[in-house]
Amino acid sequence: MSIYIMDKTNLETGISYAKMDENAKIILIQDGLYASPELFEGMKVFAFTDEITERGLEEILPQSIERITYDEGIDIMTDEKVISFC
């Protein structure tokens, strides 16, 4: 299983790679939070609570995107192979 870290810069490329990995987990960071949720349909997606709050997206971001703390993100990333598309 791999963790794909994505911002908006290389989002399309990152998603295409993640879709080839049936066990992929995605962590959206920075402006990646503005991506259309439909792009991640059927995928496990996380976002940092602090980044969601900073951008005022608490009410907008779908509940299918799991909110995590930075500490939880570190735990996820240390347990899996990390691929960055930032």
List PLM regions with ranges.
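Short, hinge-like loop/turn segments at secondary-structure boundaries
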Residues: 42-45, 63-64
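Extreme N-terminal starter segment of soluble prokaryotic enzymes
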Residues: 1-3
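Flexible, charged surface loops at secondary-structure boundaries
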Residues: 18-22, 39-42, 74-79
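Short internal beta-strands
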Residues: 24-31, 44-51
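N-terminal beta-loop-helix "entrance" segment that forms/cooperates
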Residues: 32-43, 54-58
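Histidine-anchored nucleotide/phosphate-binding helix
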Residues: 8-26, 32
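C-terminal structural segments of small proteins and small subunits
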Residues: 59-86
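A short, acidic, amphipathic alpha-helical segment used as a generic capping/interface helix at domain edges
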Residues: 12-13, 33-35, 69-72
